[in-house]
Design a protein with these regions (language model features):
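Metal-dependent catalytic cores of enzymes that make or break cyclic nucleotides
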Residues: 1-153
Length: 153
């Protein structure tokens, strides 16, 4: 967020949202989260509910109110094919776009039950190829942080 020139209040909101973005997964069975194989349609529906569940968990906590948007919209995509609300482009807050890139990069560069992690170079290449989904300005900010050594493998 700082790399993009966002003001301190918004950076604080992004920090809270980044920490809490997957809090809704508390409502998802561990067997689904850690399933090594393909998810069924029913399991995908449960997984796809976690942003709404997470937003509902924090929406009445006054000090976390500003992060609610980031928690709810971190799976929205620039092309409108994300969830839960199908937002696209500038309808998605900059904070949610930052968390989306960070979350996806983290997922790509971490081991999962269904695949081995990618290295940072592969993760960045993947994000760049998915420009219809992710804000490329945010992706390039991540690249600069990695190149400077602020973020390390």
């Amino acid at each position: 967020a700082e790399e993009l020139g966002i003001d301190k209040d918004q950076r604080d909101t992004v920090s809270f949202g980044a920490v809490l973005h997957d809090i809704g997964k508390l409502g998802v069975y561990e067997s689904i989260l850690n399933k090594p194989g393909e998810l069924s349609d029913k399991e995908w529906k449960v997984i796809r509910s976690h942003p709404e569940v997470g937003a509902n968990i924090i929406k009445n906590m006054k000090f976390l109110e500003s992060a609610c948007d980031l928690v709810r919209h971190h799976h929205e995509r620039l092309d409108g094919k994300g969830y839960p609300d199908g937002l696209k482009g500038d309808e998605i807050s900059i904070g949610a776009r930052i968390v989306a890139v960070a979350d996806s990069f983290d997922a790509m560069t971490s081991d999962r039950p269904y695949r081995k992690k990618h290295n940072y170079h592969e993760g960045i290449d993947s994000l760049r190829r998915q420009g219809e989904k992710f804000d490329l300005e945010v992706v390039e900010a991540l690249v600069r942080l990695i190149e400077r050594g602020t973020i390390r493998e």
